[in-house]
Amino acid sequence: MPLRPGRCYRHFSGPAYTRKEYIPGIPQPKITKFTSGNPNGDYDYEVRLITTEIGQIRHNALEAVRTLTLKTLSKKTGSETSFFMWILKYPHHVLRENKMMAFAGADRLQDGMRLSFGTPIGTAARIEKLGETLIVIKVKKEHLEFAKEALKIASKKLPLRTRIEIIPLRLVRQEVQS
């Protein structure tokens, strides 16, 4: 059975379905690495991707965002040590699907809406408040435009609307030192 479009799982109602010890057969999330780059670098700016909607983001969308952002930043900056990227959301919520057959004679083979709880098909990260941060990228001043461009491209892979926020780190350090 093919993967349903992301719009089928964008909105949610009810509590999160997260108790993995009681749910058999949950597929592993595609996203496994949540940090990349050099965490100990001396950076000037922090660029954040912030959600402006409430909803769910599937694990494969998070992985697509991570790989696209990492590839764009590595290519533009020249190395993977000139930035630090951190994905803050983890896909805890288990998604279920009641598979329906759509061919001639399917009504004899399936149960319809009887026993329609569904089987686990994947996981999703829930965005439950407006303004939650999805991705943080720390860069030097010369790579600021590359980070903004990478997050702008990556936001197209997400089912929710987002905005980019830039926070200077140098000003904060200078105020603390004086």
UniProtKB/Swiss-Prot annotation:
GO terms for molecular function: structural constituent of ribosome. GO terms for cellular component: cytosolic large ribosomal subunit. GO terms for biological process: translation. Keywords: Ribonucleoprotein, Ribosomal protein. Coiled coil: none annotated. The keyword rRNA-binding does not apply. It comes from the Archaea. PANTHER family: 60S RIBOSOMAL PROTEIN L10. Belongs to the universal ribosomal protein uL16 family. This is Large ribosomal subunit protein uL16.
